[in-house]
Amino acid sequence: MKSFSQHLTEFDNPQIYCDMDGVVADFISYTTNLLGHKFTDNDWDDLPVDMFLQLPPMKDAHVLWGYIKQFQPFMLTAVPRESRGPIAKRAWKDKTRWMLKNFKLPSNRMKIVLRKHKKNFAMDGRDKRPNILIDDHMGNIKEWESAGGIGVHHINANSTINDLKKIGFP
């Protein structure tokens, strides 16, 4: 006979964690337009300190968000290391404000970490079920999967929605 937790795990979808930059916020076009070249790690000092508040949404961000919001996702987004200067000091606050402004996501649905810590959310802390990460950075997907999670490599909203449906989301 199955336990209650086994039944719950069978019928409850995994928790979705969604990256911000490159999935719903357009970091690349903003920084490229501002700098006149592709962003590199040497460019942090040339960006406005409130850059994360100024990012435009990705063109299809509202399509993706319109689909995943029914599953009560968390935003799992990385902030620059402290050594990156003033932008790092306010990045967590600006990212939180950006999500509230653009998608009405409250701060308690935000998980803001250094990139290397994203993988710590790959498994559910209670029942060890794998969680899902939607991310445009393949390195994050590989680390997530190595930690036991399910990675969805984001290319565009439609491909991500199709991948989630293949996993079993309605």
Regions inferred by a protein language model and the residue ranges of each:
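Intrinsically disordered, compositionally biased, charge-dense segments
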Residues: 1-15, 123
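Active-site neighborhood of HAD-like aspartate-dependent phosphohydrolases
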Residues: 9-53
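Conserved Lys-Pro-Asp/Glu-containing loop-to-beta segment of HAD-superfamily phosphomonoesterases
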Residues: 15, 110-139
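Short catalytic/ligand-binding loop motif for oxyanion handling, primarily in non-cytosolic enzymes
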Residues: 25-28, 33, 73-75, 82-86, ...
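Substrate-recognition element of Asp-dependent hydrolases with the DxDx(T/V) motif
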Residues: 55-56, 61-93, 99
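Structural recognition of alpha->loop->beta junctions
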Residues: 95-111, 169-170
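Acidic, Mg2+-coordinating phosphoryl-transfer loop and its flanking beta/alpha structural elements
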Residues: 128-166
